[in-house]
UniProtKB/Swiss-Prot annotation:
This is Serine/threonine-protein kinase BRSK1. It comes from the Eukaryota. PROSITE patterns: PROTEIN_KINASE_ATP (PS00107), PROTEIN_KINASE_DOM (PS50011), PROTEIN_KINASE_ST (PS00108), UBA (PS50030). It comes from Mus musculus. Residues 430-457, 509-533 have a biased composition (Low complexity). Phosphorylated at Thr-189 by STK11/LKB1 in complex with STE20-related adapter-alpha (STRADA) pseudo kinase and CAB39. Not phosphorylated at Thr-189 by CaMKK2. In contrast, it is phosphorylated and activated by CaMKK1. May be inactivated via dephosphorylation of Thr-189 by PP2C. Pfam families: KA1_BRSK (PF21122), Pkinase (PF00069), UBA_BRSK (PF21115). Residues 362-383 have a biased composition (Basic and acidic residues).
Length: 778
């Protein structure tokens, strides 16, 4: 994540912003009150754009996430990042202001800092003085100490994720890999960047996230003082071996007391590695206490009273949604029990921290918005009705627009057609703790989920028991959510027919959660702008006629705005059993594999053809088998006399790091029917076509493997491409002549994202630890 010059999540959105000259104001793109301007960062998964408030002129960084181009597991990590950022309030952690969304994009409104990345600063200045390095290091440790006090582990610390403000103070960004480490449990997901990841993470072992962060801090401190990395190699396999051994050269110019600190932090044995408390007591760390820096003052702790909730008290739905996004509170019954217990526990701490955040920074409707001509403008995530600390409901803070809609339904002034539809849609949107987690579909192949938690004190005390159509009920507590951006009266469309919603039978509840079909806030009273035809008055009591018209309006709106998409990109090579349970709750291993995968789906069958001339069939088959055997980590089987099945994958490492490429090779005669083979298996010369068909796996790696096989078939000499493929598999990169072997200079632009990442800058933001397809971990 970034707000200065860093990459962001999401695909490239369709924003056409000014080139050299500004457009008239009516052509500007807005996210809420923020006008989008120049692009601050551009990565493989999205954009970060500068946003300027249309009234106050406040600058923010808007991270744009394209939901349709990312897998469901990655989107769930974005939601977890949002929830974690709401837990952290520290001067050296990047702030999250708000979250907006429409059907296609998710917009994270972040604090804007103008100093760029610490990585670029280090490249520009070279190694830093011990005084300046200590300043940065103490700020990083201060922020980490705050995060660890709330059991939050970053797990991807590196100079690229450390931003600088205008006063050169640190802001830790990109909590996409962060996790809550509950109690004494250990983490399992291997993540991070290979140059900064600790040995236990690389080995695929269970690890303490706090100790892993300490290793990364040691590597960062070494880079600040030396201008190079302690572990560096062009070959990824060799790099990982160096990290596991933990042997590095300590330059003589590093102060002796700092050398002892570095050795204590970059320690292979996690039990011997220095903890945060030990680091903060180290002489070199304390040596800068006399250096004045107001930003080094510890952040005031957030003290919240943790009380036990009464058995009949209501739990805040926004807070529960955020806790669900954190991924470690999946046992609903246990969470319910812990929140209502008399003793203090971590569940109550997280609950009251999020509730305190919601009370202090309520997310309400935007009051002053610029004119918008967008078909599907971004809408702000707003809070559900507020609950007190004792579970009592508070009056909801409603904007004038919401009041106008609810009052219009009871005889007030009419609402403009377009605005009424927008606000009616918005009232049904997922809500969160000032932008915390919303209800993502838990499966990329299924309809959206119901609320993760639906605690009701009594069986008859829910919304349906109170009456969804009660005249006094103008707000919703926790409705069963439909698709993002969809209305409450529409059913989630199946993947095969997304544009034709199927409304339920009139009068029947829409979901199994027991939520009424329609709420008082979501009765459309007018058709969208530009829709031919008018809306007839609803039937008395909302009978069959009203339901039919609502269904028709939903259908028109879907065809006008586009239906939500629930079929995410497929994860890497899921089996039939995995396809039936693609949720992190039921398949954590699959969720881990999906994070390392390149999220490439095969929309069509990919084939590569090779025509061979004047060569007998037996010779072609022998050459193919020889090519198979010459490629490391490639296995094959014979299907028939003219067909082979091959698989190229890493061997010897944890299964989470393997990305197999499976393909089939077929030989056919291009001169009529296939000639009959002789007794010795050979046939006469002719023209043969060799077809390589990708079955599963990354397309780019498939092409590289086929190119290597083709080189063998087209020549009788050993081809350097075989070794090139092996080097690529091991993570090697070709350096241009004159490139310094060890430095922190930024790598040149690469057109092949599947090639191993530069050791200087770490892998791309989304690739994390696995930089190449099929790279083995010894």
């Amino acid at each position: 994540m970034s707000s200065g010059s860093k990459e962001g999540g999401g695909g490239s959105p369709a924003y056409h912003l000014p080139h050299p000259h500004p457009h008239p104001p009516q052509h500007a793109q807005y996210v809420g009150p923020y006008r989008l301007e120049k692009t601050l960062g551009k990565g493989q998964t999205g954009l970060v754009k500068l946003g300027v408030h249309c009234i106050t002129g406040q600058k923010v960084a808007v991270k744009i996430v394209n939901r349709e181009k990312l897998s469901e597991s990655v989107l769930m990590k974005v939601e977890r990042e949002i929830a974690i950022l709401k837990l952290i309030e520290h001067p050296h952690v990047l702030k999250l202001h708000d979250v907006y969304e429409n059907k296609k994009y998710l917009y994270l409104v972040l604090e804007h800092v103008s100093g760029g990345e610490l990585f670029d600063y280090l490249v520009k200045k070279g190694r830093l003085t011990p005084k300046e390095a200590r300043k940065f290091f103490r700020q990083i440790v201060s922020a980490l100490d705050f995060c660890h006090s709330y059991s939050i582990c970053h797990r991807d610390l590196k100079p690229e994720n450390l931003l600088l403000d205008e006063k050169n103070n640190i802001r830790i960004a990109d909590f996409g890999m962060a996790s809550l480490q509950v109690g004494d449990s250990l983490l399992e997901t291997s993540c991070g960047s290979p140059h900064y990841a600790c040995p236990e993470v690389i080995k695929g072992e269970k690890y303490d996230g706090r100790r892993a962060d300490m290793w990364s801090c040691g590597v960062i401190l070494f880079a600040l003082l030396v201008g190079a990395l302690p572990f560096d190699d062009d070959n990824l396999r060799q790099l990982l071996e160096k990290v596991k051994r933990g042997v590095f050269h300590m330059p003589h110019f590093i102060p002796p007391d700092c050398q002892s600190l570095l050795r204590g932090m970059i320690e292979v044995e996690p039990e011997k590695r220095l903890s945060l408390e030990q680091i903060q007591k180290h002489p070199w760390y304390l040596g800068g206490k006399h250096e004045p820096d107001p930003c080094l003052e510890p952040a005031p702790g957030r003290r919240v009273a943790m009380r036990s909730l009464p058995s009949n008290g209501e739990l805040d739905p926004d807070v529960l949604e955020s806790m669900a996004s954190l991924g470690c509170f999946r046992d609903r019954e246990r969470l319910h029990r812990e929140l209502r217990s008399e003793e203090e526990n971590q569940e109550k701490m997280i609950y009251y921290l999020l509730l305190d955040r919601k009370e202090r920074y309520p997310s309400c409707e935007d009051q002053d918005l610029p004119p918008r001509n967008d078909v599907d403008p971004p809408r702000k995530r707003v809070d559900s009705p507020m609950l007190s600390r004792h579970g009592k409901r508070r009056p909801e803070r409603k904007s004038m627009e919401v009041l106008s809609i609810t009052d219009a339904g009871s005889g007030g002034s009419p609402v403009p057609t377009r605005r009424a539809l927008e606000m009616a849609q918005h009232s049904q949107r997922s809500r969160s703790v000032s932008g915390a987690s919303t209800g993502l579909s838990s499966s990329p192949l299924s309809s959206p989920r119901s609320p993760v938690f639906s605690f009701s004190p009594e069986p008859g005390a829910g919304d349906e028991a109170r009456g969804g159509g009660s005249p006094t009920s103008k707000t919703q507590t926790l409705p069963s959510r439909g698709p993002r951006g969809g209305g409450a009266g529409e059913q989630p469309p199946p993947p095969s027919a997304r544009s034709t919603p199927l409304p339920g039978p009139p009068g029947s509840p829409r979901s199994s959660g027991g939520t009424p079909l329609h709420s008082p806030l979501h009765t459309p009273r007018a058709s969208p702008t530009g829709t031919p035809g008018t809306t007839p008055p609803p039937s008395p009591g909302g009978g069959v006629g009203g339901a039919a018209w609502r269904s028709r309006l939903n259908s028109i709106r879907n065809s006008f705005l586009g239906s939500p998409r629930f079929h995410r990109r497929k994860m890497q090579v899921p089996t039939a059993e995995e396809m039936s349970s693609l949720t992190p709750e039921s398949s954590p291993e699959l969720a881990k594999r999906s994070w390392f995968g390149n999220f490439i789906s095969l929309d069509k069958e990919e084939q590569i053809f090779l025509v061979l001339k004047d060569k007998p069939l037996s010779s072609i088959k022998a050459d193919i088998v020889h090519a198979f055997l010459s490629i490391p980590s490639l296995s094959h089987s014979v299907l028939s006399q003219t067909s082979f099945r091959a698989e190229y994958k890493a061997s010897g490492g944890p299964s989470v790091f393997q990305k197999p490429v499976r393909f089939q090779v077929d030989i056919s005669s291009s001169e009529g029917p296939e000639p009959s083979p002789r007794r010795d298996g050979s046939s006469g010369g002719g023209i043969y076509s060799v077809t390589f068909t990708l079955i599963s796996g990354p397309s780019r790696r498939f092409k590289r493997v086929v190119e290597t096989i083709q080189a063998q078939l087209l020549s009788t000499h050993d081809q350097p491409s075989v070794q090139a493929l092996a080097d690529e598999k091991n993570g090697a990169q070709t350096r241009p002549a004159g490139t310094p072997p060890r430095s922190l200079q930024p790598p040149p632009g690469r057109s092949d994202p599947d090639l191993s990442s530069s050791p200087r800058r770490g892998p791309p933001k989304d690739k994390k630890l696995l930089a190449t397809n099929g790279t083995p971990l010894p």
